[in-house]
């Protein structure tokens, strides 16, 4: 079964709609979003509702976590978190998993067990060495950069950001 894999949509419903309208996306039997479905973009509710309507597997990203615990975060986007929380009134994000296993693949937002931890290609050999022996593929998002790295018998992949591209 083909899988549509995306990360870091960040409330950008226009970007999600554009992705879903492609023939490639329409031929996929499964949809997975690696976290940060919400915040920054103006339509977090539409993003979450659309993904749920599609039966997508959604992971917990750091922005969903921040919405669940807003008082723990007094950073630069505190006000934006409050606006996003208002948009999502009545929608629960607390049940989103941090990690998902599919066969020998481990999917996560940041690093396994931690949606806040950023990982970059130079750090991947160390991160991959901490995985259970039966995991051969790590798929993560969070840093908005697309990369594909092999280290030994393991591979790590990041699809980049679907809704908040920071690479130009």
Feature locations, PLM:
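Active-site environment of divalent metal-dependent phosphoester hydrolases
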Residues: 10-15, 39-42, 65-69, 113-115, ...
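N-terminal start-of-chain detector that recognizes signal peptides
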Residues: 3-5, 29-30, 109-111, 127-131, ...
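N-terminal active-site segment of His-dependent metallophosphoesterases
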Residues: 1-56
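Conserved beta-sheet core of the metallophosphoesterase superfamily
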Residues: 121-168
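Beta-strand-turn-beta hairpins that frame and shape the catalytic cleft
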Residues: 1-4, 100-107, 151-155
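Active-site neighborhood of phospho(di)ester-bond hydrolases with catalytic His/Asp-centered motifs
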Residues: 6-7, 31-36, 57-62, 107-108, ...
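Short amphipathic alpha-helical segments
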Residues: 17-18, 44-46, 71-72, 119-120, ...
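Active-site neighborhood of divalent metal-dependent phosphoester bond hydrolases
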Residues: 47-108, 114-137
């Amino acid at each position: 079964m083909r899988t549509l894999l995306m990360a870091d949509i960040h409330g950008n419903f226009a970007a999600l709609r554009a992705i879903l309208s492609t023939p490639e996306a329409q031929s996929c039997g499964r949809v997975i979003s690696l976290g940060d479905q919400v915040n920054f973009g103006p339509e977090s509710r539409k993003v979450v509702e659309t993904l749920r309507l599609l039966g997508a597997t959604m992971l917990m990203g750091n922005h969903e976590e921040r919405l669940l615990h807003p008082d723990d975060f007094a950073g630069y986007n505190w006000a934006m978190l409050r606006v996003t929380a208002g948009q999502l009134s009545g929608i629960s994000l607390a049940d989103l998993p941090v990690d998902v296993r599919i066969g020998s693949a481990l999917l996560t937002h940041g690093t396994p067990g931690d949606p806040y931890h950023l990982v970059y290609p130079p750090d991947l050999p160390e991160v991959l060495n901490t995985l259970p022996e039966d995991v051969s593929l790590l798929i993560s998002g969070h840093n908005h950069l697309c990369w594909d790295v092999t280290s030994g018998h393991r591979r790590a992949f990041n699809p980049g950001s679907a809704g908040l591209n920071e690479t130009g």
